[in-house]
Amino acid sequence: MRVYLGSDHAGFELKTFLLEHLSTAGHQVVDIGPHAYDAQDDYPPFCLETGRRVVADPGSLGVVIGGSGNGEQIAANKVAGVRAALAWSLETAQLSRQHNDANVLSLGARMHDAVTAAGFADIFLATPFSKDPRHQRRIEMVAGYEAAPGPQVLPTT
């Protein structure tokens, strides 16, 4: 599987680790950057480009990495068609794919050691979307809003 990796300075070391780990596991890994450590770099360009590449390459997935993973997830989710999920456990990584068909995983390098974070990436990449109609319906609701934002019809009880 093709996997796009993007980070900032806080995620640089983990990105380097994941590049090797995922390549060894047989994935075709594309390093979006940064390609050198720069303590002053900003995550948005790397995360936005990672998201853009994932959307433009059906069947691929992405991983964005920062200190907490929060800003990186927010940035990636600004790309139309991206469903980026912040993982903090094996279960959240797995469910993001299984229930939400997430196509970008966000990781906090300051929150997890490299081996734990690699486990999150492994399960994310290995888990297929369930295609359960209720999950598909919810994804379509969000995509519909993305295409035409506006007031929502709220369900009545």
Regions found by a protein language model. Name each.
Residues 46-87:
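Helix-adjacent hinge/juxtasegments
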